[in-house]
Amino acid sequence: AAGRGAWVRTWAPLAMAAKVDLSTSTDWKEAKSFLKGLSDKQREEHYFCKDFIKLKKIPMWKETAKGLAGKVENPKYKKDKQLNEKISLFRGDITKLEVDAIVNAANNSLLGGGGVDGCIHRAAGSLLTDECRTLQNCETGKAKITCGYRLPAKHVIHTVGPIAVGQPTASQAAELRSCYLSSLDLLLEHRLRSVAFPCISTGVFGYPNEEAAEVVLATLREWLEQHKDKVDRLIICVFLEKDEGIYQERLPHYFPVA
């Protein structure tokens, strides 16, 4: 009888964990631990949406760019078929992507705001804000990682972009580059293989869209050249048609189609 009692006590926490409801839970640590123990299929039951998008449904750049071969006469970089399989341009809702991590264009407080920041916090639920509160802010150009909670993405990487008024300075360009590199550092540190980036700093933070795209593409290209075997996909996720057009025009210069 004593042995049976010990068995019940041992397994009681697991029985409790199985009952965690992410929409009502008030303990982010408990919820985070619970989610880590689930399979990918089990996690689906806790997503905030049913129309989530799997990574395999997001086309690689080599597929998106069919028909563009040779249209760029003097690309900035050499053709690399392998790299063209590691990058994607996707227009849609970043909160619905089932990837290892999505990046949040946050403010210094990390407690939510407007634009994509607010969308991510609303979709993930209040537990995300609770965990962010423990991180005690984030400096511009740096990044911090949390659980994704009710998001299809397992993690959220929060980064704070520079605020630019008019033409960005060299310092602001360096800070924007640092946002991407800091986020990618966390990707490697946590052994994650897929990540989606929104357009960082281009909304209310005022960074010009075209100039931002140049910084982003150069940063991702150079990083992938060094780390291509450590990741499966880097996704540039845009929401506005304007940004989609900018990246469609600029991507072939940085990722020429083989």
From Swiss-Prot:
GO molecular function annotations of the record: ADP-ribosylglutamate hydrolase activity; deacetylase activity; hydrolase activity, acting on glycosyl bonds; O-acetyl-ADP-ribose deacetylase activity
Entry's localization field: Nucleus
Keyword Transport tagged: no
EC number: 3.1.1.106, 3.2.2.-
Positions of modified residues (N6-acetyllysine): K96
Alphabetical list of InterPro entries matching this protein: Macro_dom, Macro_dom-like
EC category: hydrolase
GO CC field: nucleoplasm; nucleus
Binding site for substrate: 92-94, 105-107, 112-117, 200-206, 239
Regulation: Subject to competitive inhibition by the product ADP-ribose.
Any one GO biological process: DNA damage response
Record-listed N6-succinyllysine modification sites: K29, K36, K62
Main location: nucleus
Keyword terms: Acetylation, DNA damage, Hydrolase, Isopeptide bond, Nucleus, Ubl conjugation
Highest taxon of source: Eukaryota
Start and end residues of each Macro domain: 74-255
Disulfide links within the chain: none
Catalysed conversion reaction: 3''-O-acetyl-ADP-D-ribose + H2O = ADP-D-ribose + acetate + H(+); 2''-O-acetyl-ADP-D-ribose + H2O = ADP-D-ribose + acetate + H(+); 4-O-(ADP-D-ribosyl)-L-aspartyl-[protein] + H2O = L-aspartyl-[protein] + ADP-D-ribose + H(+); 5-O-(ADP-D-ribosyl)-L-glutamyl-[protein] + H2O = L-glutamyl-[protein] + ADP-D-ribose + H(+)
Crosslink (Glycyl lysine isopeptide (Lys-Gly) (interchain with G-Cter in SUMO2)) position: K71
Coiled-coil regions listed: none
Pfam families, sorted: Macro
Annotated function: Removes ADP-ribose from aspartate and glutamate residues in proteins bearing a single ADP-ribose moiety. Inactive towards proteins bearing poly-ADP-ribose. Deacetylates O-acetyl-ADP ribose, a signaling molecule generated by the deacetylation of acetylated lysine residues in histones and other proteins. Plays a role in estrogen signaling. Binds to androgen receptor (AR) and amplifies the transactivation function of AR in response to androgen.
PANTHER family in UniProt: ADP-RIBOSE GLYCOHYDROLASE MACROD1, GANGLIOSIDE INDUCED DIFFERENTIATION ASSOCIATED PROTEIN 2-RELATED
Subunit structure and binding partners: Interacts with ESR1; Interacts in a manner that is estrogen independent but is enhanced by estrogen. Interacts (via macro domain) with AR.
Family: Belongs to the MacroD-type family. MacroD1/2-like subfamily.
This protein's name: ADP-ribose glycohydrolase MACROD1
Organism in which the protein naturally occurs: Rattus norvegicus
Gene: Macrod1
